[in-house]
Amino acid sequence: MRLILPADTEGIFLERKSRFTGVALVEGKKTLIHIHNTGRLPLLKKGKRVLLKRAESDRRKTGWDLLAVEHRDEFVFVHSGFHSIVAGKILEELFPGSTIESEKRFENSRFDFLIDRRTFVEVKGCTYEEDGVAMFPDAPTERGRRHIEELISSVKSGFKALLLILVFLESDCFLPNRSVDPAFSRVFWRALKSGVNIDVFRVKYDGEYLCSTEKLSICEEV
């Protein structure tokens, strides 16, 4: 998978003002930027280089969208608004020739995709790691837990189900973040035992392209 998404400029992150806004030094000026990610994003720290895209509308209070933040030797893509686009491209490669529909409802949830009317797909983006282990979530997520429970329910109803996890930073393998959200971790392992397929893909960003480079394994839980 390769998706062109060039950043328009680079800045220096200064602070997070609220859930969706932050301040960065852009072209020598303190500028309000939009953060399209509801996670805690612990890697978003003062002084980090960030990649930004100019907002399409000049009516917005925030003139720039945050795309990626510097972390070690790479830029980590953090704009969750592109998760479905990236996932859709990956699914086209995983299921060539299949009918892929987006935003399909099952019981009390709306899943990201439905493939050939028989496989529900939910997508999660991961921007957190510890000691080479990618972890999701970085903040408690009742919504995320509910989505996985509904995937389990869809399998019991005769459908197939896939949890597609996109890991945006260098990692060796993936685990649910038990210390941050024990309930999510429990339902993750229950989903595996219940027949939900879980695929984890590493996605890199170089300021120009988003590329899916490899499939990651699920770590052994300690």
UniProtKB/Swiss-Prot annotation:
It comes from the Bacteria. Pfam families: SfsA, SfsA_N. One of its GO terms (molecular function) is DNA binding. PANTHER family: SUGAR FERMENTATION STIMULATION PROTEIN A. Belongs to the SfsA family. NCBIfam families: sfsA. This is Sugar fermentation stimulation protein homolog. It comes from Thermotoga sp. (strain RQ2). The gene is sfsA.
